[in-house]
From Swiss-Prot:
Segments passing through the bilayer: 64-84, 109-129, 131-151, 156-176
Species, as recorded: Homo sapiens (Human)
Parts forming coiled coils: none
The gene coding this protein: TP53I11
Induction trigger: By p53/TP53.
Name the UniProt record assigns to this protein: Tumor protein p53-inducible protein 11
UniProt lineage: Eukaryota, Metazoa, Chordata, Craniata, Vertebrata
Length: 189
């Protein structure tokens, strides 16, 4: 007796199956734009770690500001770590330093933030750039408040402190400006 042949396999034509085509397009990330202009990310790009990049030009001067911020944070951090007395003297004009440890800890924290700033300079991911700009704005805002409170307690006022306060306010404004510019949705043409 001859062995029975199994029935031939039926091939599914996914090209004609609409549900299957939709699933395939969703997984591959082909097409799929919603009403707001957002392009849906595919599962593959999520696994590979691709982020939504700038779809238009970056705001004018953003990279220059990121570079200036990274240099500023690094410079002050190194000065606080290596020369805490001179940094304190430059800000508070001749006031005596009682302990160098808090100033050096401040330098270590600034050095950590500066590493984040340097890394953000070389990325095109909007989320990372926005977080670093928000970090800068918060840092400069807190520094402005702390120096203002210190002035109110001690009553010391000098040109150096006034320049520090004005520069911190300016840096907050610039960081917030770029934060919102990077977060803006591109205009549809």
């Amino acid at each position: 007796m001859a062995a029975k042949q199994p029935p031939p396999l039926m091939k599914k034509h996914s090209q004609t199956d609409l549900v299957s085509r939709l699933k395939t397009r969703k997984i591959l990330g082909v097409g799929g734009e919603d009403d707001d202009g957002e392009v849906h990310r595919s599962k593959i790009s999520q696994v590979l770690g691709n982020e939504i990049k700038f779809t238009i030009r970056e705001p004018l001067g953003l990279r220059v500001w990121q570079f200036v911020s990274a240099v500023l944070f690094s410079g002050i951090a190194i000065m606080a770590l290596a020369f805490p007395d001179q940094l304190y003297d430059a800000v508070f004009d001749g006031a005596q330093v009682t302990s160098k440890t808090p100033i050096r800890l401040y330098g270590g924290a600034l050095l950590s933030i500066s590493l984040i700033m340097w890394n953000a300079l070389y990325t095109a991911e909007k989320v990372i750039i926005r977080w670093t700009l928000l970090t800068e704005a918060c840092y400069f805002g807190v520094q402005f408040l702390v120096v203002t409170a210190t002035l109110a307690e001690t009553g010391l006022m000098s040109l150096g402190i006034l320049l520090l306060l004005v520069s911190r306010l300016l840096f907050v404004v610039i960081s917030i400006y770029y934060y919102y510019q990077v977060g803006r949705r591109p205009k549809k043409a």
